[in-house]
């Protein structure tokens, strides 16, 4: 698994698109209009607390860059079949399960590197400009509890769902899912936003960081009066936040397991 992880990491980190896609996304977002990415460096506009600034930054960058993250990973698993190297890999000592785990962790980590660079870069710049060095500790905590579970969830489905459909179709559907299930508010239409299976990290933000938006008026977790799927929106508590993280990881493991079984079944038929 380690050898596969290293190989996949090196292959993915060298792809220009892994760096260009998040860079262009951030540049375009900043140029479109005012946002926290710009306000962080304006003493009159930036949030008064380092915690609010860093968690708000995590929310914006996660919401923006996770779409590209999933799309960039969509062809990593099916590529072996397309290039007809799967039979060669099957002849190596590494088991298919270990190779899948190595590909998942290696390619996923490499694709997440630019996201981490962007996030910690902005957090460091904020800490320097504001003098609030506690922002770096908040950034580490937010990355581990908000970013990582969501990215692991997205990576698992981005690798395995293209086994069932063409990668371009998955990218289109995934972009639609991400906007519907994470950005659309529950009072507009039925959505998974604000539920315990919300990969944007609503429950960790609300329960672990007491985050309700920069102005304190947003609700990222918990029941919404009149909204559908409120049975998936218990009141946000630290216990429920950790349960939400665990559910995302369990779903990621389930997706990988299903992908592994599908590939084994395909090998058996062939």
Where are these regions (language model features)?
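Terminal transmembrane helical anchor/hairpin motif
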Residues: 38-44, 48, 172-270
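Secretory targeting signals
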Residues: 27-75, 101-169
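Hydrophobic core positions of alpha-helical segments in small-molecule transporters
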Residues: 21-23, 101-102, 173
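Cytoplasmic juxtamembrane interface segments
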Residues: 1-6, 77-86, 153-193
